[in-house]
Regions:
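Residues on the lipid-exposed face of transmembrane beta-strands in outer-membrane beta-barrel proteins
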Residues: 3, 42-46, 97-101, 115-117, ...
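Transmembrane beta-strand segments that form the barrel wall of outer-membrane beta-barrel proteins
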Residues: 166-179, 183
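Transmembrane beta-barrel strands of outer-membrane/channel proteins
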Residues: 3-7, 56-60, 113-119, 157, ...
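Ordered, amphipathic secondary-structure segments that act as subunit-interaction surfaces
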Residues: 92-98, 105, 110
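Transmembrane beta-barrel domains of bacterial outer-membrane proteins
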Residues: 1-17, 27-62, 98, 182-190
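Repeated loop/turn-to-beta-strand initiation elements of outer-membrane beta-barrel proteins
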Residues: 51-54, 109, 163-167, 198-202
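A contiguous binding-surface segment within folded domains or other stable secondary-structure elements
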Residues: 150-171
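Extracellular/periplasm-exposed beta-strand and loop segments of Gram-negative cell-envelope proteins
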Residues: 11-38, 60-93, 120-148, 176-181, ...
């Protein structure tokens, strides 16, 4: 089990279509939502039987900002005009469960494959003065949200340099249409772990999560392009 801090560098773009397809809204550049964040992250793995295991992961991230627009932003059939002050925010929660089977195990390495599920919750909002056909509709808040279980396949490889040092890698992938969602998902991690004591160790890894999805819901017709990446510093406990 690992617990620690995920230092994210995030890039968030969303699209909210109206009567015609809209353009991507860059929440980092256009809405000034910060690209850097730190959040708690937890990981566990339990081996049952000689070759089978189940693993899990959880982290979330949220941020909001206020900014003066430097260019127009389109939201459905509405426009927020350059020079106006707006508030904006995004949030993402990721929960992962993965069932795997090891296919090649040696004294210093292990390779396995499996399948799992990502439960994702994503939301974004913008508040300000909205215009349609150059006429103000007043100040208000508009928001979109989506949550869905997305299946994936994946694999992992571990290699122990010595009794105390180990390199671990894993990758999950999805490229499929599920219900109202179609697109791709990547969730990858590469880590170096040091076993400081018998049951306690330290870890430093690079975490990469990317989701590029088109959404066709009654309350959100559009899409999202999300990338969260950065180091994960952890305390590892094993028994």
């Amino acid at each position: 089990m690992s617990m620690g801090t995920f230092l994210t560098d995030k890039k968030v773009k969303i699209r909210v279509n109206g009567s015609v397809p809209g353009e991507d809204i860059d929440f980092n550049e256009g809405a000034a939502v910060t690209s850097n964040d730190s959040t708690f992250s937890g990981v566990f793995r339990w081996r049952f039987g000689e070759k089978w295991s189940v693993a899990g992961q959880y982290w979330d991230s949220s941020d909001s900002s206020f900014v003066t627009l430097t260019e127009d932003i389109g939201w459905e059939d509405y426009t927020l005009k350059a020079g106006s002050n707006i508030g904006a925010g995004v949030e993402l929660t990721v929960a992962r469960v993965f069932f795997g089977r090891s296919f090649h195990t040696g004294a210093r390495h292990e390779f396995g494959l499996g399948a799992g599920l990502h439960w994702l919750e994503f939301g974004a909002f913008i508040e300000g003065e909205f215009f349609i056909n150059d006429e103000s509709t007043g100040f208000r808040r508009e928001a979109v949200s989506a949550d869905a279980p997305l299946p994936n396949i994946g694999g992992w490889y571990w290699y122990a340099f010595s009794p105390r040092w180990m390199l671990t890698t894993r990758v999950d992938w999805l490229g499929i249409t599920v219900g109202d969602y179609s697109g791709s998902l990547w969730n990858a991690n590469a880590a170096i772990n040091f076993q400081a004591w018998r049951h306690v160790g330290l870890g430093l890894s690079y975490q990469y999560f990317a989701l590029d999805v088109d959404i066709e819901k009654s309350d959100w017709n559009g899409g999202a392009d999300l990338t969260y990446r950065g180091p994960f510093i952890s305390l590892n406990v094993n028994w």
